[in-house]
């Protein structure tokens, strides 16, 4: 705690930005080179689910039960202690029907199999709506902070939130986890959590800021003091939140595990960005804007005197 109280959060912004830059470079590289592993929610396809399977066949045996070479292009996962989920591409494009694949799996697993199918067109619509929901959330956040505080705070918060999105999705690309609607819900949850942490710091900065005049050194000092006043609260809150998230990641089934993974990465990135990115960006932007205003006034004075 004493060590955190002595950190120059704003003055050492180059260090914090460099750390984020390394992670962002890795994450953006993973997204650009490896891409995501989209689920059938976005690409279309069929998901076959079976529970209470007898005999505990291996995933390889389940894959071999699929007709033709469909097993080579399908994803087979164990679900819980005695269940399986098989995700296939669009079966009509492969020359099969849901009924044929379902019958083959029921014969292999000896259990009733349920199926959910999504057409490629509908999957594309879901993907578009998911992107629109994230964009709308970011736009509403900018509007809210601009009204509640001022635009400089909104701009700094937006930088931190975009940082969190890229880090979260980058880790998804690195580990190859499936990106589906659960991922979108998790990203929106991360945005809300990260924004809450950032607002706490911004609100303290605004409370401590002088009413009149701007002085860069004084503003950076009060920003540092404001962060120090709430930094332990942010860390304690994050740690307490991550404990059940880790439990979900370890013990949860596939859907809960995917959700928990996004929360784990996103909350960690959000806590870091709220403390080490948002406030320094705010101070740098205010200094840049003050410099522009000062330069404009000097040019106006020189023009008036000449």
Question: Where does each model-flagged region fall?
Answer:
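A structural signal for conserved, well-ordered secondary-structure elements
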Residues: 1-306
């Amino acid at each position: 705690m004493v060590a955190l109280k002595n950190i120059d959060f704003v003055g050492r912004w180059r260090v914090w930005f460099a750390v984020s830059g390394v992670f962002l470079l890795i994450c953006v590289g993973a997204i650009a080179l490896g891409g995501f592993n989209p689920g059938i929610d976005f690409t279309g396809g069929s998901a076959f689910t079976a529970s209470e399977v007898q005999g505990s066949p291996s995933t390889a045996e389940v894959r071999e039960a699929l007709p033709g070479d469909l097993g080579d292009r399908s994803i087979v996962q164990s679900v819980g202690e005695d269940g399986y989920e098989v995700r296939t591409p669009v079966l009509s494009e492969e020359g099969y029907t849901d009924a044929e694949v379902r019958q083959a799996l029921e014969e292999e697993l000896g259990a009733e199999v349920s199926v959910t199918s999504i057409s490629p067109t509908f999957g594309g619509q879901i993907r578009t709506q998911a992107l629109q929901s994230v964009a709308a959330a970011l736009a509403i956040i900018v509007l809210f902070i601009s009204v509640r505080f001022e635009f400089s705070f909104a701009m700094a918060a937006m930088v931190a939130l975009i940082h969190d999105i890229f880090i979260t999705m980058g880790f998804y690309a690195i580990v190859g986890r499936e990106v589906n609607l659960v991922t979108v819900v998790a990203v929106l949850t991360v945005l809300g959590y990260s924004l809450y942490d950032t607002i706490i710091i911004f609100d303290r900065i605004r409370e401590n800021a002088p009413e009149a005049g701007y002085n860069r050194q004084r503003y950076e000092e009060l920003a540092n003091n404001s962060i120090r006043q709430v930094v332990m609260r942010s860390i304690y809150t994050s740690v307490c939140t991550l404990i059940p998230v880790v439990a979900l990641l370890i013990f949860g089934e596939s859907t809960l595990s995917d959700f928990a993974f996004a929360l784990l990465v996103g909350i960690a990135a959000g806590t870091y960005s709220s403390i080490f990115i948002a406030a320094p960006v705010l101070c740098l932007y205010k200094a840049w804007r003050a410099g522009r205003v000062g330069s404009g006034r000097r040019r106006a004075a020189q023009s008036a005197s000449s």
